[in-house]
């Protein structure tokens, strides 16, 4: 299980948040910083918390192929996370073109409408577990 802490909410003091991450890790629950890069978190947040996962916000992906700065940010974050053993999910994958560009930076997970629209619990169970689940 992975709990996501959204970037748009104001964090506790980093030391308190590190304790929260440690508590959940001891219970076998992983934490992810969601929408990374658009709110309060910074490289210092990564250094202090060393979260098991970050999810790069879709806004950096939307203009990939047109805006070199956004692609450079994604490349930088993925390189940093690879070197520090932080897993990365890139949000906002909506086309084959975007998928091809992002894949060359080797994120652990990809998320977006290219793969599926959001599903209800019943639709998810039918699709991935089988009818009648």
Segments predicted by a language model, with ranges:
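Catalytic-core regions built around general acid/base machinery
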Residues: 19-27, 76
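EAL-family c-di-GMP phosphodiesterase catalytic domain
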Residues: 1-14, 29-133
